[in-house]
């Protein structure tokens, strides 16, 4: 019996995992870039608990383990979401078995849960709310599984809620349901156990925070961004989540939950009416204990999520921006409840004679309907990913000297997808550039400086969800056509989900002047400073412009210092080079920092110069050379702790882009094994 249950659980997991891989959408959420950067920081430099995202360790701990074991890749980034969302089917199966359903019925119920549109959607995206949903699901399982062992139940539930709390503070929204469970059923030992365990666990964690950041409650001081909702918009805000559940995406008009909420409410209404009409207690139409438990759980969570203010100020009603992924934690209990109600239909007297056939007849079409609606729910992400991966493939094949694309797309290409071992493309990431007119202005201003063969990606807008549809190189929003020097390489599928549909396109720059890499470098015109001979004033005014990001203006002052005060020009040489680095002019920055390292071998700036040179090499696609420079810096400049620690962190990142711990262990084992076999 145990073997059959394990095999059933394995089949559920594999089915769910395969469905999530099939409908995989990629990095299409607006905060994916921020969270990926967070994970890289934690992996290379450790967490900074003064930041609210770092503080919420439940958001990144699974990805940290995945990167540590498998190395940094899209696959290892998404593995926790694919795997943990697939586990929810096993949790559903285990709960249904505890509530008295047969193995086949529980298996079909688990299939219904893992195939539900929103469950699949959350599993195909980098949705951190999924981890709170998992904590709630495991807490519910522990509550049911250990009812006869209240001490163990209390400890398990407390641990689940503690972990969920450090994904999102919204974990406290389950406390009313938990209180109803313990008080209504007079489970005083369990209530005492979960209370004491929670106090001990949270108390120890708060003591840890105080030791680390000097505050017992940093999650109150650093919390998510919220906004004061005007009174005339309260109804609109309160209707946001219900509309997402019942109508779907307001951006694309696609479903999110499919038929699940309609099935849930329709069957629940039947049960409520049947219970009110006092049908026999043995009737499957009567509300049972599991119905009440699930209803109180998802119902109270929804009410608090929708109406309770977000924040710790009460001078107005504060809310976070209401986006679809925030509903994720309540999706599992809702979907499980719908599955249970469908299974209860198969227990009606007319169907009870053949329960297996009834369950198959009812649940298999429901699962197929789920999959059909899942395709609709994930369609925008699928369309985007198809174009994204096709563009990536062509860029990898072409290996252009430079690549120009929307900032987020470019950063993913450079930092996640392009092979650091073979890529030699300088991917231009235009930070702080958002709307199409900004990108168009940048392109027209810099086109003359781009080398022959530079590639440009257009039509591939920024992230899919949260409305960044007018960001990036969107030709439909350009004020004029591209320069005729841009030659079309390929047109990809049309991004039909956009308000103004546009195909992704890849372009190559032709007829650009070829500039010798070792040619003479332009010098700044310092004639405007001919009468200024005060070293202190030149330094002050140059740094003032540097701090205001007027790098071209700052370089005039630094050049004047370098020419007129060569014996005191050390700082000016460094910031002169750094100004090019700040502008992402990697070739020029590398050249200037090399000059500094050669001329000022014993300068306090030399270690920092080596770090900047290595970073330029990496951004120009030469990871091998970057690694050599970083290793040199660590070996020869340990006396500069800041530069050495930066170099160590960057070395770690470069190595983890190639492989993780398991890869290194495999090489260590397989190498001697191959030599022995030979």
Where are these regions (language model features)?
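Extracytoplasmic catalytic/substrate-binding loops of multi-pass membrane glycan-assembly enzymes
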Residues: 23-38, 50-65, 72-75, 170, ...
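Short acidic/glycine- and proline-prone juxtamembrane loop motifs at membrane-interface regions
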Residues: 31, 55, 121-131
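Signature aromatic-anchored transmembrane alpha helix within multi-pass, membrane-resident enzymes
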Residues: 10-11, 159, 196-199, 341-373
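Perimembrane helix-loop-helix junctions
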Residues: 142-145, 150, 173-203, 272-279, ...
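Membrane-interface transmembrane helices that cradle and orient dolichyl/undecaprenyl
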Residues: 43, 47, 98-100, 137-154, ...
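Hydrophobic/aromatic-rich transmembrane helices and adjacent perimembrane loops
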Residues: 122, 129, 173, 315-346
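Membrane-lumen/periplasm interface segments of specific transmembrane helices
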Residues: 19, 191-271, 301-305
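Membrane-embedded, lumen/periplasm-facing catalytic core of multi-pass transferases
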Residues: 361-417, 425, 431-432, 517-528
């Amino acid at each position: 019996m145990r073997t059959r249950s394990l095999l059933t659980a394995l089949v559920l997991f594999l089915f769910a995992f395969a469905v999530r891989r099939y409908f995989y959408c990629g990095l299409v959420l607006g905060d994916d870039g921020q969270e990926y950067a967070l994970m890289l920081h934690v992996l290379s430099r450790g967490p900074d608990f003064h930041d609210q995202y770092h503080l919420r360790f439940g958001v990144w701990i699974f990805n940290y383990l995945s990167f540590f074991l498998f190395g940094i890749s899209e696959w290892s980034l998404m593995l926790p979401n694919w795997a943990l969302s697939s586990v929810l089917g096993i949790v559903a199966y285990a709960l249904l078995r505890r509530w008295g359903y047969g193995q086949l019925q529980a298996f079909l119920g688990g299939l219904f849960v893992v195939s539900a549109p929103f469950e699949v959607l959350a599993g195909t995206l980098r949705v951190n709310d999924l981890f709170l949903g998992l904590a709630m699901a495991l807490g519910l399982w522990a509550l049911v599984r250990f009812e006869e062992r209240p001490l163990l139940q209390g400890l398990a539930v407390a641990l689940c809620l503690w972990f969920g709390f450090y994904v999102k503070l919204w974990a406290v929204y389950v406390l009313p349901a938990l209180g109803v469970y313990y008080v209504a059923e007079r489970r005083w030992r369990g209530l005492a156990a979960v209370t004491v365990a929670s106090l001990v666990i949270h108390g120890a964690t708060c003591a840890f925070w105080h030791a680390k950041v000097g505050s017992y409650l940093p999650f109150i001081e650093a919390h998510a961004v919220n906004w004061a909702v005007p009174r005339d918009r309260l109804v609109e805000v309160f209707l946001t989540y219900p509309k997402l559940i019942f109508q779907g995406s307001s951006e694309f008009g696609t479903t999110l939950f499919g038929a699940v909420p309609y099935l849930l409410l329709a069957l629940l209404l039947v049960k409520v009416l049947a219970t009110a009409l006092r049908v026999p207690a043995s009737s499957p139409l009567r509300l049972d204990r599991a119905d009440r438990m699930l209803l109180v759980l998802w119902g109270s969570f929804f009410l608090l999520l929708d109406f309770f203010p977000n924040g710790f100020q009460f001078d107005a009603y504060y809310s976070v921006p209401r986006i679809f992924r925030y509903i994720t934690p309540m999706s599992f209990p809702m979907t499980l409840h719908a599955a249970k109600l469908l299974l209860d239909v198969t227990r009606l007297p007319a169907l009870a004679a053949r329960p297996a056939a009834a369950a198959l007849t009812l649940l298999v079409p429901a699962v197929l309907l789920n999959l059909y609606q899942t395709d609709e729910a994930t369609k925008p992400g699928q369309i985007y990913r198809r174009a994204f991966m096709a563009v990536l493939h062509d860029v990898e094949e072409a290996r252009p000297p430079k690549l120009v694309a929307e900032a987020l797309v470019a950063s993913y290409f450079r930092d996640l997808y392009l092979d650091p071992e073979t890529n030699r493309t300088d991917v231009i990431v235009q930070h702080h550039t958002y709307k199409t007119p900004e990108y168009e202005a940048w392109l027209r201003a810099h086109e003359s400086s781009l080398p022959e063969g530079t590639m440009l990606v257009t039509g591939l807008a920024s992230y899919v969800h949260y409305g960044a549809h007018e960001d990036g190189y969107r030709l439909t929003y350009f004020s004029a056509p591209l320069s005729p020097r841009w030659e079309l390489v390929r047109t990809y599928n049309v991004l039909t989900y956009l308000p103004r549909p546009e195909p992704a396109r890849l372009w190559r720059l032709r007829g650009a002047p070829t500039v010798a890499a070792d040619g003479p470098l332009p010098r700044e015109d310092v004639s405007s400073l001919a009468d200024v001979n005060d070293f202190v004033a030149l330094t002050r005014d140059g740094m003032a412009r540097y701090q205001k990001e007027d790098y071209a203006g700052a370089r005039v002052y630094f050049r004047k210092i370098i020419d007129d005060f060569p014996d005191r020009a050390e700082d000016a040489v460094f910031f002169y080079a750094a100004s090019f680095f700040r502008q992402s002019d990697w070739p020029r920055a590398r050249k200037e920092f090399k000059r500094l390292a050669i001329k000022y071998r014993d300068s306090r700036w030399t270690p920092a110069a080596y770090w900047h040179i290595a970073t330029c090499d990496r951004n120009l696609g030469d990871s091998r050379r970057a690694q050599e420079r970083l290793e040199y810096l660590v070996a020869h400049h340990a006396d500069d702790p800041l530069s050495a620690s930066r170099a160590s962190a960057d070395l770690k990142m470069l190595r983890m882009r190639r492989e993780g711990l398991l890869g290194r262990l495999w090489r260590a084992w397989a190498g001697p094994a191959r030599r022995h076999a030979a």
